[in-house]
Amino acid sequence: AQCLVGSEMCIRDRSERMLIVTIMVIVGFMSGVLSNTGTAAVLIPVVIGIAAKSGYKRSRLLMPLVFAAAMGGNLSLIGAPGNLIAQSALKNINLSFGFFEYAIVGLPILIVGIIFYATIGFKILPNKEAPADDDSVFDQQQDFSNVPKWKQILSLVILVLTLLGMIFEEQTGIKLCIAGCLGALALIVTGVISEKEALKAIDLKTIFLFGGTLSLAAALEKTGAGELIADKVIGALGSYPSPYILTFVVFILCCVMTNFMSNTATTALMVPICLSIAQGMGADPRAVLMACVIGGSCAYATPIGMPANTMVVGAGGYTFMDYAKSGFPMIIIATVISMIILPIAFPFYP
């Protein structure tokens, strides 16, 4: 992937702004069909290499990269862990989101975000020299010249087939998790990667975080704590809260939480609460959960909101305030876009 995508990002006398557009487009759409964290991890060393060759400062290129990864995660069901958490909760009540349904809100946010950072937002991006003592693993360029062409082609074929299996889950009867496992197994069986390499690629931190927060979410639901919080939220808004105001409150609450917790943990924690709110009002749970997931993805203002943000702190020489300064305007933009689209595409009372 680094070899193929890197060739598309090559300099070709592009201006710095156009390079940011190219990076964000590629990262955004790759994050929609792969994991947003995985996409960022693959392309960070590519962008660092481009910065070195072009003479542009990496701090100006890496932050748009991780922001685009977060935005792109909202293009499909598999773009971010939070998307699947909401989907699992909906399936328990015989509802679901379509594979690309998140893109109804996510795609406009990505498009406007790209335009913003290529124009007005360009001026607020960090403009720092690379740290002199940076020894990040992402700074180490990997040589893919010895990788056989058949492995590159076969890996792409398996990726496409795996994605098709995920997209047509209902038609094939094969669950998302099974399709993903079959794709990974195919890579090992065909010799594209070894079993050791496959195991090394598994992020145990993410798995334990996912499992732990889902357990916490289940506890909130079974003990009635989720319902209690839901009642407090509804009570604070009055006997008959406006669906629009409630959508805004859920969205902002998830925005704030995701920047100080992980976005996955925020979604896992808020999903049962949002379900309780929807059921208490007799509203469509899909409307509340969409606001929860999109709000939970707005982890732009801190380096701890999502793993990709943390990955580039050292390489970009960023401070906490760099994220706040560059990311807060994007949160405002995402909020405005969401508050326009959500009530239309996902009404509380369809």
Language-model segment annotations:
Residues 14, 54-67, 73-85, 89-145, ...:
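Juxtamembrane and boundary regions of transmembrane helices in multi-pass small-molecule transporters
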Residues 28-29, 50, 89, 163-167, ...:
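Alpha-helical transmembrane segments of multipass membrane proteins
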Residues 36-40, 109-111, 174-184, 235-246, ...:
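Structural signature of hydrophobic alpha-helical transmembrane segments
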